[in-house]
Structure formats: C-alpha cells, structure tokens
Amino acid sequence: MQNDRKKHTRNFSIVAHIDHGKSTLADRLLEATGTLTQREMENQVLDKMELEKERGITIKSQAARLVYKRDDGEEYILNLIDTPGHVDFNYEVSRSLAACEGAILVVDATQGIQAQTLANCYLALDHDLEIVPVINKIDLPSARPDEVKEEIEDVIGIEAHDAPLVSAKTGLNIKDVLEAIVEKVPVPDGDEEAPLKALIFDSYYDSYKGVVCYVRIKDGVVKPGTKIKFMATNKEYEVTETGIFTPNFFPMKELRAGDVGYITASIKNLRDAGVGDTITEASRPAKEPLEGYRPAIPMVYSGIYPVDGAKYEELKEALEKLKLNDAALSYEPETSIALGFGFRCGFLGLLHMEIIQERIEREFNLDIITTAPSVIYNIYKRDGEMLKITNPTNMPDPTEIEKMEEPVVKASIITPSDFVGAVMELCQNKRGTFIDMEYIETTRVVVNYYIPLNEIIYDFFDMLKSKTKGYASLDYELNGYKQAKLVKLDMLLNGDVVDALSMIVPEERAYNKGRAIAEKLKEVIPRQMFEIPIQAAVGAKIIARETVKAMRKDVLAKCYGGDISRKRKLLEKQKEGKKRMRQIGSVEVPQEAFMSILKVD
C-alpha cells in the first residue's frame, strides 16, 4: 500500500520570471483539483502576507497538497511548493527545488524568456529536476506561443513542442498542466526503512506551536513522539505534530519518505531550524546530512533608526518579531551622533531591505529613518589585521590601510538588441568589466558583466529599466572580492561630521559624488536663522562646499536716510548675533536628506 501511495505522489514546484503568472497558475491548480472551495478562493492564495498580495510578488516559500483524480479514476497526490521569483531570494528557491522532483517552467507567451526564467531554470537543472514547460497568457492578443516554444528549445534546450498552452487568468487548459505533471514528473524515491532524513525548505514562527518546519521527507518515517535532531546545529527536540498542507495545516499521524508536510516540536528559535538543514532521528541518526545547506548571508547593510528616539525598544521588538520569520535578517544595535540609537541591519538584497522597512512601518506602526545601504568591505591593515566593515563610520584611518577589497557580482542582463549600446554604457559607468554576450534570437541578447555590488545596490535596476524602456531583465550572483581604490566620503554640516551620511566610494568618483550630494543637501535642508556650510570631505581635505543662506531680518528698515555709520553699526550687530547663533546652533537633518542621497548619481 505504501509503495502504491508513493507511486501516486508527485512533488513539483513552479518557477518563472517575475510577473509571468506563477502565483495565478498556482491558484488555478488549487481550484481545478478542488483543494479549496469557491468560498475560500481568493487571488494569490499562497501569498499570505499583505505585502505579497499588494506588490504581486512571492516572498516566502509556501506549499499545498493537491489531490487530482484522473479520468481513469486513479487518484494522485501532487505536492506543490511555491517559490519566490526574485533574485534576492535565490537561496530559498534552491531549497524549495531540492524538495521536488520536477518543476513547471512558466513562460509568458507575450514576453518569452527573461533573465530570471533562465536563472531559475538553471537552478532547477542543477538539482536534476524534470522540467515541464508551460506557456501562459495565451489569451492575450500579443501572444506568440510558437515562437516562445522555439525559444525554449533553442535557449534552454528542453523539448517544448507539446508544452501546454494555458491562460492562468481564465483557467484555459489547466487540466493539461495537471496531466503533464503526472506524466512527466518522476515518482519520489526514498527508503522508508532507512534512518530519517528530512530537508527543511522553509520554516516560520507560530505563536502557539513554536517554529513550524516545512519539510520534504527523503528517507524514513516521522511521527509525533519521535526524538529528532537538527544536523547543522545538533539541537534535539521531540516532535509534537506532523501534518500536510491543504494550504492550511491538516494534522496527520505520520509523514513517510516522499511526503511533503510540516513538523512542529516546540522549537523556540528559528535559528535552530535553518532553511536547508537536515532533520534526522536522535536515536538513529543519518550518516551525513543532505547537501546544499548554507546559512543565509546578508549582502547589503543599512542603519534603521526610530524617528522618535523613545521608540527604540519598540523597534527592537519589531526586529525580533520579524527575525522569527526571516532567518536571513540580521541586526545589531548601533549609535549615531546624528540619529541617536538604532540598529545596523543586514539584508539579502535591496528588495529584501525594502520589504523589511515597509513591514516595520506597516505591521508595527513605527516611523523609521534608514541610512544609505552599504556592502561588506574587506580591509587589510598594515599590521596584518583584516577587518570586515559594513558601516562606513568604522573605517580605520587611511594611513593604517594596506589595501581594500569590495564584493563583485556577475550580472546577466537580457535586453532587446536595440538597447545593447545603452546597457553596455550603463555597465561601464558602473565600473563593470565585460565578460561576454550572446544572441538568444535575432532581437534579444544576453550580456554578462562583472559589476561591483555597491554600484548595483543604489539605483542600477531603475536605471537599467529606464534605459531599455522597461524591457531588460537582470539576474546577479556574488562572485567574490576584488581589490579597489576606495575612500570614505564624509559630509559636514556646520563643521560637524554627520556620521549617518558617510559612505565609501571609489577614489576617482569622490569629487563628483561629494559635489552632487552637497548640492542635493542644499535643496532639502531647511533654512535656519544662521548660514550653514555643507562640506564634503575625504580625510581632512574638503573637496566641495555649498552654503544654505540664513534667513535675515531687514534691520535697516527703520533708518530713513541717515548716516552710513549708523547702518553699518546695525549690520555689524546683526552679524555678531548670527555668529553667536551659529556657534551654539544645531542643524536638524530631515529624513528626505538621507533618502535623497540614494538617488544621487
């Protein structure tokens, strides 16, 4: 009976470029198999977060179990694992794929193959998954299914002549997709007699059950009461509940090899159940864990401060709660002279950073100031010490530094061939090194570049979109460190360094960047009763200056005619007063000032 059950099980995930209709297709599959009633049906069922629905993106992996009855009466259990499509969440995608045997590759019939289609598809091929191409949005007048089929065959090299042509929006031909899954996705392998091995492909914190681990059982059996051990952290727990997803939790008495489900074991800390870790039995552990586990490493750092200093504790609580559900978020307290107490937070990428900031503001109702994002630099000092720096204010004195290294990414950009020149110019301006380019078809090109990560984290994506009228798509992965000539650029207001505005920039750009930021600050800092010099400095050398003029009262209004010396006396008196004010006056830096710097090119 058990083997029979395994024969009728299929584990698959859906991969696609952003906006090619992945979550909508998942909705239709849930609907077609009757997993959810009409009443429970809503758009993007698997995207549970408000933000996910609003932005139309998938952030966390989710899972659902579909029961599909074929026309011959046979019942199949299809486990769908929904994956995020954005490049920041690449690791989550790779863990979700490791839990499957097959992947549906959704391609938009109007747009064809895009950068993330390729990136996610190669990820799936790395995991030896069977790929089932599905062409979506064929109800649109601009759909060109035959060309897209050829493109899939030429570029990715998988057969697509019999790919289902569907419209996830209208529900057209959804049954073909279910048939293709049953036909093409392999039966899960795994030995129920062997020691337990379960891959965690996602985990989240539930305030009643503790940490809930989403798992794919590779070998063995797990049931409530089993003593389990996490192989990366060596922590041991007793299982309290096992079950499956009908998107909502449904307890079962056990999970066997080949199943996808969840395990709870009164775990208090998400860190103990890292995504990608292997669960095994404490009394009969597996010899080695499943491969591919790596702790989530933040790539981008930024300071987050409460606008109202008294709300520091609330911000700390908010970050603690978000951390429960997001193992990739890291934070530590820091203080800034300009902004008071706050936290230095690490993120997977820019989208991840935006989402966390937005969730703090929305879910916890806090006003926050965020500083310019920065990456991790390696600094080698003359005394042989090596420092990793995420905050420009911690950079040692330039005289102590032997050399500095910055992280570099390998970026693949797919663009219509008309815009190749503009894309290459953008990459060169961002200190990119050309690798190669190849034509996918006569009208589209893949361009590969090595680009320093700190050039990408500001506005690279926006500029790429505007230079290509929104047609280009980008995918990048970290590619190690390389030596660079970098300096710390400080901004001074009224002679004081504003630490939150400091940044690390390439030496040859320091002057232009300093000048541009000074001009920008001049626009956003409100005028005071005394004049404020805004200076950009590298070390002790001032490289640019702007002045915010003082507001002044017309002290000569009451002199009609009269002697010049009388007027001079009044003006001198005013000047003295302004000078005194300037010595004791402090400058408030508005939130816009921090944000405007990000947009300076």
UniProtKB/Swiss-Prot annotation:
Swiss-Prot/TrEMBL catalytic activity: GTP + H2O = GDP + phosphate + H(+)
Record-listed GTP binding positions: D19, H20, G21, K22, S23, T24, N136, K137, I138, D139
InterPro entries associated with the record: EF-4, EFG_III/V, EFG_V-like, EFTu-like_2, G_TR_CS, LepA_C_sf, LepA_CTD, LepA_IV
Gene Ontology CC terms, in alphabetical order: plasma membrane
EC id: 3.6.5.n1
GO terms of biological process kind: positive regulation of translation
A molecular function GO annotation: ribosome binding
SUPFAM superfamilies, per database record: EF-G C-terminal domain-like (SSF54980), P-loop containing nucleoside triphosphate hydrolases (SSF52540), Translation proteins (SSF50447)
Keyword Iron-sulfur: no
Domain of life: Bacteria
Keyword Cell membrane: yes
Membrane topology: Peripheral membrane protein
Domain annotation tr-type G: ranges: 7-189
Compartments reported by the entry: Cell membrane
UniProt keyword terms in alphabetical order: Cell membrane, GTP-binding, Hydrolase, Membrane, Nucleotide-binding, Protein biosynthesis
Main subcellular location: membrane
Pfam families the UniProt entry points to: EFG_C, GTP_EFTU, GTP_EFTU_D2, LepA_C
Family: Belongs to the TRAFAC class translation factor GTPase superfamily. Classic translation factor GTPase family. LepA subfamily.
Annotated PANTHER family: TRANSLATION FACTOR GUF1 HOMOLOG, CHLOROPLASTIC (PTHR43512:SF4), TRANSLATION FACTOR GUF1-RELATED (PTHR43512)
Known role: Required for accurate and efficient protein synthesis under certain stress conditions. May act as a fidelity factor of the translation reaction, by catalyzing a one-codon backward translocation of tRNAs on improperly translocated ribosomes. Back-translocation proceeds from a post-translocation (POST) complex to a pre-translocation (PRE) complex, thus giving elongation factor G a second chance to translocate the tRNAs correctly. Binds to ribosomes in a GTP-dependent manner.
Name by which UniProt lists this protein: Elongation factor 4
Species of origin: Clostridium novyi (strain NT)
